[in-house]
Structure formats: C-alpha cells, structure tokens
Regions:
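Short, low-complexity N-terminal intrinsically disordered segments enriched in polar/charged residues
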Residues: 1-38, 136
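A beta-strand edge to alpha-helix "cap/lid" segment located at domain peripheries
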Residues: 2-12, 62-136
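Residue-level detector of alpha-helix boundaries and kinks
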Residues: 5, 17, 46-49, 98
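Short charge-dense sequence patches
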Residues: 10-22, 41-44, 60-64, 119
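Short, mixed-charge, low-aromatic patches
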Residues: 16-26, 50-52, 67-70, 92
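Generic helix-packing signal
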Residues: 25-27, 44, 113, 127
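A solvent-exposed, acidic/Ser-Thr-rich amphipathic alpha-helical stretch
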Residues: 29-86
Length: 136
C-alpha cells in the first residue's frame, strides 16, 4: 500500500484524465495509445456486438483510431465532467466533427475508464443516439 508521500498508480486523477483528453483532442494516435496498457480492451459504442465493438490490445486500438481520424479529421471532445472512484473514472463529454462525406457529428456521451499501473486497461464508450424525425 502506498504511503502518504507516494501516489497509487492505479488511482485515476484529474490530471491524468486531462492529459488523456488532450491526447484524444490532438488526434495523435501514438500519443493516445501511450496511455493504454498493451493488453487494454476498448469497447466502442457502435458495432456488431451487444457491447458495440470490442478492440483488444494497443495495436488494434491504434489502427482503429487512425482509421477513425482519417474519416473524421477534425473530431474534438469537449469534456464536461469527470467522476472518480478508485481506479475508475467517468468522462462526460460532447464530441463534434465533420466526416469526410460532409456529415456533421455531434454526440453526447461518456467513457468509463479502468486503470492499472497508471494506464488505461479498459475503456467503455457510451453515447446518446440521435433519431431523425423521419425515422421515429
């Protein structure tokens, strides 16, 4: 157990969350994945599984984010709030951007992070779905 003078690397902190948020907003994939453990799991909000889409491992996360930023090069998160509980943190945000096809992206959501050794070992993304009037 760490003493009062030693920070516990598993505890999520406001500073760490701000650094992770800045990395995502930089869209620098190498910078982003430096915050993940090699064996991290990232569940995307959308995908073919009940959990969305499961990404396993740093390299899979890197490739997926690189592809996402190629399609939405100006993607940007505005973090509204962080909630902390031991080695977990929740980030509440709005994300905006414009796809290569010209479609505007504007979602509200949150990420649930789990940390191990000062790095993200799990990230689970949720967002609100926007239903268009003609689809209701």
């Amino acid at each position: 157990m760490p003493d009062a003078n030693t920070a516990d690397p598993d505890i999520a902190t406001p500073q760490l969350m701000k650094e992770i948020s800045a990395a995502f907003n930089s869209r620098d994939v190498d910078r982003i994945v430096s915050f993940f453990t090699d064996d991290a799991t990232f569940w995307l909000a959308r995908g073919p599984e009940p959990v969305g889409r499961t990404l396993k491992g740093k390299e899979t996360i890197r490739k997926t984010l690189a592809a996402r930023f190629a399609v939405i090069p100006d993607m940007r998160w505005d973090h509204k709030e962080y909630i902390f509980a031991g080695n977990r943190a929740i980030s509440v945000w709005t994300v905006k951007g414009k796809g290569a096809d010209g479609e505007e992206l504007n979602y509200q959501g949150c990420d649930i992070y789990t940390f191990r050794g000062g790095k993200i070992c799990a990230k689970d993304t949720y967002w609100k779905l926007v239903e268009h009037k003609d689809r209701l």
